[in-house]
């Protein structure tokens, strides 16, 4: 009943859905012989919003961007690394195209295998940023795991199933969405086999973890506790199929270049061999000649190498690339610090010579793009401490001496600026 008569002969209107009277709610909207309150409308909107991601995931999330569009988006955030970006764009495009094909395919259709990706490159070259940018663009659940924290089941440390649990948490335990997500496993080179010879002690954080990752990467049903953990022993685990999860593994693989050089040099012996000095070739150039056998010799087990067919090497970043990273990307460091100072009503100017000095310092530290923030932070820390209490500061100027000699940045005051 939408209407009920009270003792005072006046009509009271009630929500048809929850039964609350017009006096208990803010608004009651009338339809043909029905009424709905504002609270029920809000609840309906929440239900529709919650169901939308699952529907989009099942449908393949609308239009799939082409490899060129994926690369163009990566260009906004990652400087250089053209070949890895192209390789990643094609691999990701083919992966999600494969999922669409799988949804529509009949029993007699050709099955398309999954191509997981291995990124090799020095620290600070953009491996993690590439994976994060991809996941953000495709609007799929993304999780980043550190291989160094993983151990075999039964030992202190994280089990490999914890990776899938984190993926579920990132999409609020929506199983359908999680099964189409992206997992980035960093520092994969740190779990390499410790030696070729079998040892009496167990290698619980090396080869043991690689064995545990095998099935997860290839595709298996992983058992994950439900949200909030199991409340009682009879509560079922969530079953997650990892077949359609794209795994991207990354690592610096320090020392792998020596393995590659030993193999390539061994092929040319005697008077006919071409002699090329090691100093003439950069690490990234050597990595271009990588073969699966090199990874196996490094300590990655053959089964795991076979499950990562797409291997791409990131180049070392030079001075020019580091200067571009400081200024050009969407979230460039200079833009970030300019925004921070703009909140104090102060403009930030970093001169070209200072940018080059920052790049040179990062190169000397051998930390890649990751070292840029600490250098810039170090040069501005004193100024950022004083600025909130300083009056009439219009501009902060960072020049070469600020970076190289540790001098304080130049402060331009409003009165001086007007006179100039």
Swiss-Prot record:
<feature type="binding site">
    <location>
        <position position="37"/>
    </location>
    <ligand>
        <name>Zn(2+)</name>
    </ligand>
</feature>
<dbReference type="GO" id="GO:0046983">
    <property type="term" value="F:protein dimerization activity"/>
</dbReference>
<dbReference type="GO" id="GO:0140662">
    <property type="term" value="F:ATP-dependent protein folding chaperone"/>
</dbReference>
<dbReference type="InterPro" id="IPR003593">
    <property type="entry name" value="AAA+_ATPase"/>
</dbReference>
<keyword id="KW-0479">Metal-binding</keyword>
<dbReference type="GO" id="GO:0016887">
    <property type="term" value="F:ATP hydrolysis activity"/>
</dbReference>
<feature type="binding site">
    <location>
        <begin position="122"/>
        <end position="129"/>
    </location>
    <ligand>
        <name>ATP</name>
    </ligand>
</feature>
<comment type="subunit">
    <text>Component of the ClpX-ClpP complex. Forms a hexameric ring that, in the presence of ATP, binds to fourteen ClpP subunits assembled into a disk-like structure with a central cavity, resembling the structure of eukaryotic proteasomes.</text>
</comment>
<dbReference type="InterPro" id="IPR019489">
    <property type="entry name" value="Clp_ATPase_C"/>
</dbReference>
<feature type="binding site">
    <location>
        <position position="18"/>
    </location>
    <ligand>
        <name>Zn(2+)</name>
    </ligand>
</feature>
<comment type="similarity">
    <text>Belongs to the ClpX chaperone family.</text>
</comment>
<dbReference type="InterPro" id="IPR010603">
    <property type="entry name" value="Znf_CppX_C4"/>
</dbReference>
<dbReference type="InterPro" id="IPR050052">
    <property type="entry name" value="ATP-dep_Clp_protease_ClpX"/>
</dbReference>
<dbReference type="GO" id="GO:0005524">
    <property type="term" value="F:ATP binding"/>
</dbReference>
<dbReference type="Pfam" id="PF10431">
    <property type="entry name" value="ClpB_D2-small"/>
</dbReference>
<dbReference type="Pfam" id="PF07724">
    <property type="entry name" value="AAA_2"/>
</dbReference>
<keyword id="KW-0143">Chaperone</keyword>
<dbReference type="InterPro" id="IPR027417">
    <property type="entry name" value="P-loop_NTPase"/>
</dbReference>
<feature type="binding site">
    <location>
        <position position="40"/>
    </location>
    <ligand>
        <name>Zn(2+)</name>
    </ligand>
</feature>
<dbReference type="InterPro" id="IPR046425">
    <property type="entry name" value="ClpX_bact"/>
</dbReference>
<keyword id="KW-0067">ATP-binding</keyword>
<dbReference type="GO" id="GO:0051603">
    <property type="term" value="P:proteolysis involved in protein catabolic process"/>
</dbReference>
<dbReference type="GO" id="GO:0051082">
    <property type="term" value="F:unfolded protein binding"/>
</dbReference>
<comment type="function">
    <text>ATP-dependent specificity component of the Clp protease. It directs the protease to specific substrates. Can perform chaperone functions in the absence of ClpP.</text>
</comment>
<dbReference type="GO" id="GO:0008270">
    <property type="term" value="F:zinc ion binding"/>
</dbReference>
<feature type="domain" description="ClpX-type ZB">
    <location>
        <begin position="3"/>
        <end position="56"/>
    </location>
</feature>
<protein>
    <recommendedName>
        <fullName>ATP-dependent Clp protease ATP-binding subunit ClpX</fullName>
    </recommendedName>
</protein>
<keyword id="KW-0547">Nucleotide-binding</keyword>
<dbReference type="InterPro" id="IPR003959">
    <property type="entry name" value="ATPase_AAA_core"/>
</dbReference>
<keyword id="KW-0862">Zinc</keyword>
<dbReference type="InterPro" id="IPR038366">
    <property type="entry name" value="Znf_CppX_C4_sf"/>
</dbReference>
<dbReference type="GO" id="GO:0009376">
    <property type="term" value="C:HslUV protease complex"/>
</dbReference>
<dbReference type="GO" id="GO:0051301">
    <property type="term" value="P:cell division"/>
</dbReference>
<feature type="binding site">
    <location>
        <position position="15"/>
    </location>
    <ligand>
        <name>Zn(2+)</name>
    </ligand>
</feature>
<dbReference type="InterPro" id="IPR004487">
    <property type="entry name" value="Clp_protease_ATP-bd_su_ClpX"/>
</dbReference>
<dbReference type="Pfam" id="PF06689">
    <property type="entry name" value="zf-C4_ClpX"/>
</dbReference>
């Amino acid at each position: 009943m939408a209407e009920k008569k009270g003792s005072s002969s006046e009509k009271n209107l009630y929500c048809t859905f929850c039964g609350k009277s017009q006096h208990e709610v803010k608004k009651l909207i009338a339809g043909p012989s029905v009424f709905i309150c504002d609270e029920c409308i809000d609840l309906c909107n929440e239900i529709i919003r919650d169901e939308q991601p699952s529907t989009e995931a099942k449908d393949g999330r609308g239009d799939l961007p082409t490899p060129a569009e994926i690369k163009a988006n990566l260009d906004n955030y990652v400087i250089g690394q053209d070949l890895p970006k192209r390789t990643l764009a094609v691999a990701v495009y083919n992966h999600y195209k494969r999922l669409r094909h799988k949804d529509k395919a009949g029993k007699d259709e050709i099955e398309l295998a999954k191509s997981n990706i291995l990124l090799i490159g020095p620290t600070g070259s953009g491996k993690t940023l590439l994976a994060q940018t991809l996941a953000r663009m495709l609007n799929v659940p993304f999780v980043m795991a550190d291989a160094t924290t993983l151990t075999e089941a039964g030992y202190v440390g994280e089990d490999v199933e914890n990776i899938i649990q984190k993926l579920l948490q990132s999409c609020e335990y929506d199983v359908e969405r999680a099964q189409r997500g992206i997992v980035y496993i960093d520092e994969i080179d740190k779990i390499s086999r410790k030696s070729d010879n079998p040892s009496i002690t167990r290698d619980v954080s090396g080869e043991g973890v690689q064995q545990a990752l095998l099935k997860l990467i290839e595709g298996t049903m992983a058992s994950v506790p439900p949200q909030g953990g199991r409340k009682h022993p009879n509560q079922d685990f969530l079953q997650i199929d990892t077949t359609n999860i794209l795994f991207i593994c990354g690592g610096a693989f320090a020392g792998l270049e020596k393995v590659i050089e030993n193999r390539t040099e061994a092929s040319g012996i005697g008077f006919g061999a071409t002699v090329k000095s090691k100093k003439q070739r950069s690490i990234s150039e050597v990595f271009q000649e990588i073969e699966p056998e090199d990874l196996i010799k490094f300590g990655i087990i053959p089964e795991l190498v076979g499950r990562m067919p797409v291997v791409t090497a990131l180049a070392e970043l030079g001075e020019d690339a580091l200067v571009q990273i400081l200024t050009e990307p969407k979230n460039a460091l200079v833009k970030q610090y300019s925004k921070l100072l703009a909140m104090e009503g102060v403009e930030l100017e970093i001169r070209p010579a200072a940018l080059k000095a920052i790049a040179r310092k990062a190169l000397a530290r051998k930390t890649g793009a990751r070292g840029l923030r600490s250098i810039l932070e170090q040069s501005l820390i004193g100024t950022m401490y004083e600025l909130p209490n300083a009056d009439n500061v219009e501009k902060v100027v960072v020049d070469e001496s600020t970076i190289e000699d540790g001098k304080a940045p130049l402060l331009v005051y409003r009165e001086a600026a007007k006179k100039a």
